[in-house]
Regions:
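Flexible, glycine-rich phosphate/dinucleotide-binding loops
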Residues: 14-15, 58, 97
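NUDIX/MutT-family hydrolases
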Residues: 70-72, 80-114
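Acidic/histidine-enriched, glycine/proline-rich intrinsically disordered or flexible terminal extensions
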Residues: 111-124
Length: 124
């Protein structure tokens, strides 16, 4: 797999590109939810989770007030769009798509400020 930032193109509104992610199921840890959501949306098995940050601006999602806990991870396998993902792309930090959903441009800017391009993948 190419090294880079894995993004999905959303099937549902709001449309655009986003970091893979979703909601935590009852009784599930944040880390387990990140692993499950990555598998469901990208077909990748992830490991080596490292916390990037938490994002809680009430305006980050127009549908409801959500809080995202964002992890950086290594992905294993052949990536393919699945579940809520229409498409999947692997991007370099300097060539991200223009239409990013939610506050993912801010999250990716935080990633770029903290890490060099040799790290692979971002997963909330």
């Amino acid at each position: 797999m190419d090294r880079g930032i894995v993004l999905i193109e959303r099937k549902n509104e709001p449309f655009g590109w986003a970091l893979p992610g979703g909601f935590v199921d009852y009784g599930e840890s944040l880390e387990s939810a990140a692993v499950r959501e990555a598998r469901e949306e990208t077909s990748l098995e992830i490991s080596n989770l490292r916390l990037l940050g938490c994002y809680s601006d009430p305006a980050r999602d127009s549908r409801m007030h959500t809080i995202s806990t964002v992890y950086i991870a290594s992905g294993l396998g052949i990536p393919s769009a699945a579940d809520d993902a229409l498409n999947l792309g692997i991007f370099r930090p300097d060539s991200l798509p223009e239409r990013l959903c939610f506050d993912h441009a801010r999250i990716l800017a935080d990633y770029a400020a903290k890490y060099s391009t040799h790290h692979s993948g971002l997963l909330p």
